[in-house]
Every structure is written in C-alpha cells, then in structure tokens.
C-alpha cells in the first residue's frame, strides 16, 4: 500500500503535504502527456515520493509505471510548490504538493500504458497542447518560458 493511501486512512480527505516528481519526456520537440484516470485531465507523468526514495528514484519509478519507458539520466530542472500546487481530487482528497521537475534523457522502452493511472499517452507540440490539469499547466508554462519546448 502506498504511503499516501496509508495516511489517508487516518486523515480522510483533509489537506496533506506530499513531495513528488514529474518527468518531462521530450521527443521531436513534443512533450509526452498522460490522460489521467483519476481526474480525466491531461498531465505530465509523475507521482508521489515513497518512503526511503530519493526524488530521482521517484522520477524513474513513475516514468516506468506510467509509460513503460526508462531513462539513463534525470536532470533536476526546478522545484514547484505553493498555492498553485494545491489540488482537490474528484473523490474529495486535498493535497498540497512539492513537485520536483526532471528532464529524462537517453530514453528507452516501448511507450504503453502499464498501470491504471493513465487512459492515454500522447506526444503534443507546444501549439497543440490539450486542456491540462492545473498543476501541469503551471509546470508547462514554466517549461515553455524556459525555451525547453520550442
């Protein structure tokens, strides 16, 4: 059982803090996004830190779990937090996230959905981005301003 699910048993839907990692996979100037099953919105592959993990281990695990991809290198680009990283899930769970954004490099594997967290996986260009989950929108705005997705 995940750490967050264990905590939720004790606090219900009350707001909680969570640290996690989000992984940018950029191929041919397009970014990989996933349509999330829990929110039915597009986001960036990633998830919560588990007990004993480093953030780069979280990035590697989440990338593999959600996309079946692996990367040799994970470059820490930025850490996001604050009011923009509050989220209320459809089930009522409230979360304040601290999110480490990584860029994955030297990627291998066959892109496919490997867990129940994603409904679709797709690469999008800067000018064709779908409506995004609120935290992903903040992150991608930062990514575009940095010139990482041209």
Walk through the language-model features, giving the residues of each:
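Active-site-adjacent beta-strand/loop module that shapes the phosphate/pyrophosphate-binding cleft
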Residues: 80-110
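Nudix hydrolase/Nudix homology domain
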Residues: 40-42, 111-150
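A short coil-to-beta-strand element that immediately follows conserved catalytic motifs
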Residues: 70-80
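Conserved Nudix-box catalytic region and its N-terminal flanking loop in Nudix hydrolases
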Residues: 26-66
């Amino acid at each position: 059982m995940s750490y967050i699910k264990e905590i939720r048993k004790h606090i219900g839907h009350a707001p909680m803090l969570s640290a996690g990692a989000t992984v940018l996979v950029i191929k041919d100037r397009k970014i990989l996004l996933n349509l999330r099953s829990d929110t039915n919105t597009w986001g960036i592959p990633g998830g919560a830190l588990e007990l004993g993990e480093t953030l780069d281990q979280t990035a590697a695990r989440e990338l593999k779990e959600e996309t079946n991809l692996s990367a040799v290198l994970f470059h820490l680009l930025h850490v996001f937090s604050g009011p923009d990283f509050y989220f209320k899930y459809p089930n009522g769970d409230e979360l304040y996230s601290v999110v480490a954004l990584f860029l994955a490099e030297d990627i291998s594997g066959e892109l496919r959905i490997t867990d129940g967290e994603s409904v679709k996986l797709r690469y999008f260009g800067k000018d064709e981005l779908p409506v995004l989950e609120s935290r992903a929108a903040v992150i991608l705005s930062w990514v575009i301003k940095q010139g990482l997705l041209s």
